[in-house]
């Protein structure tokens, strides 16, 4: 039930953020899909596949329905139907896309000096990470995916994930609403995916932050090729309860 709720929350947030939703439904009387999930699009030379946040690779026979004028989105939410003879127990998950659309996707901010606003959020709900190396896609970026609540009105909203500090292999980042209505009072749920840059890029940002403050720079040092991500945020009455750290393999 919770997975279903999260998925519909994502679909709602995609609409709020102005993203398109593609529909291939055949009819209300038909059981049109078998599962719904969030995934990373892997545009391989041979074929396009989807790496689900469940860690499973899915092979759609109609991936082109997700393609826009500028190519495939990085991250998508999709309803999938298994191909004939394929089940959840099958080794190769061949599917068709029943409905789908792009997710709100950004990179962890590499230019924090350009961010001027930090509008208060309502709550941090959940964080997950996706590491494509577990299924041998070493060139695919890792992502940090966050469920949260924010104050929303009819105006556009932009959410950023901004590096704050590092201690050993733990990176603290702040989830900030950087564009929005500072007078909004309606609480709404949101979901955002953030591409995790390379460790060298992150350390460059941390160095610039320290230099601006006149402090000694701290560096992120992976352990076994992995880092831990800790997400913090600010609400109307101060710091929100941070989410549990998540470990992910990075470049």
Task: Report each predicted region and the residues it spans.
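First exposed extracellular module after export/assembly in secreted or surface-exposed proteins
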Residues: 34-251
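Bacterial Sec-dependent N-terminal signal peptides
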Residues: 2-8, 14-45
């Amino acid at each position: 039930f919770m997975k279903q709720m999260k998925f519909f929350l994502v679909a709602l947030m995609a609409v709020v953020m102005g993203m398109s939703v593609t529909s291939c439904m055949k009819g209300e009387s038909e059981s049109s899909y078998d599962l719904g999930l969030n995934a990373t699009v892997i545009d391989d030379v041979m074929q396009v596949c989807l790496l689900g946040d469940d860690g499973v690779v899915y092979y759609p026979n109609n991936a082109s329905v997700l393609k826009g004028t500028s190519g495939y989105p990085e991250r998508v939410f999709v309803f999938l139907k298994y191909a004939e003879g394929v089940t959840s127990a099958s080794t190769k998950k061949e599917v068709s896309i029943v409905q789908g659309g792009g997710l709100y996707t950004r990179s962890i901010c590499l230019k924090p000096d350009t961010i001027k606003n930090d509008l208060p959020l309502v709550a941090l709900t959940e964080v997950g990470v996706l590491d494509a190396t577990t299924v041998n896609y070493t060139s695919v970026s890792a992502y940090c995916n966050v469920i949260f609540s924010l104050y929303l009105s009819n105006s556009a909203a932009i959410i950023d994930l901004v590096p704050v500090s590092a201690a050993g292999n733990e990176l603290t980042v702040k989830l900030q609403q950087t564009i929005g209505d500072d007078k909004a009072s309606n609480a709404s749920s949101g979901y955002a995916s953030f591409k995790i840059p390379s460790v060298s890029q992150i350390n460059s940002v941390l160095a610039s932050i320290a230099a601006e403050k006149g402090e000694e720079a701290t560096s992120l040092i992976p352990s076994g090729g992995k880092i831990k991500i800790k997400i913090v945020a600010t609400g109307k009455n101060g710091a929100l309860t941070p989410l549990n750290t998540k470990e992910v393999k990075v470049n």
